[in-house]
Structures are given as C-alpha cells and as structure tokens.
Amino acid sequence: MSGADFQLRQPTILIVDDDASLRLLCRVNLELEGYNVLEARSVADAEDAVAGDEVDLFLLDVHVGADDGLALMRSLRARDHGAPVVVFTGSAVLDSATIAEADGIVPKPFRLEQLLDVVRRLAPHR
C-alpha cells in the first residue's frame, strides 16, 4: 500500500440524546471539527448504531426520553466496548459512582467550547 492509498479514519462520535436540537448543534459543530458523527434519539437507536458502526466516543444524555442513559453506559462497559463515554446532564447532582464511571461530564446547559474541549481530549484526531 502506498502512502497515497493510506487514509486515516477520523474518530466517530455517537450522540445519544432525545433532544433533536441538541443533537443538531453537536453534530454540526463536531463535523466542522472533522469528526464523523452518528445520532441516536433513544437507547435502542444507540444499540443499533453500536452494532453497525465503530464508535470512538459516546456523548450520552443521562435521561434519553424514558430510557436510562446510564444503563446504556453500564451495558457498554460490561461488553468491554472500550470507547470513552461523556455524560450530558441537566441534573445538579450526580452520585459519585456515576461520576467515577463516566470519562467526562458535561453539565447542561453547556458552552460549546466545554464540549469540544472534552471531545478533543478523549477522541483526538489520528
């Protein structure tokens, strides 16, 4: 394989949130940063995305509609997925176990630069 044939794969980020406007805001800005972005509006959609695509970072709401986003995080950990998980939360209080399990916490509402700083740290371009 020549150097011209070799292409670096950009990190893929899966945004799991039931808020369509938040997903859009994140997707557009992450794509501008050069990331591949997938979206899921439910835990079931996220499970489907994980089965079909290689995900390098999860951006996961604590409450995804009626679903428990933290249960998805624990399921990913149990399957030894390996990709970092960043938790979005509008809750002022998270228990210490949740904080310890997540690779990053982004409180809602957040500034875009807060999110991008966490993403750049956990899913750097290769």
Model-derived features: positions:
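Acidic catalytic/metal-coordinating carboxylates
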Residues: 42, 68-71
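Active-site residues of response regulator receiver
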Residues: 61
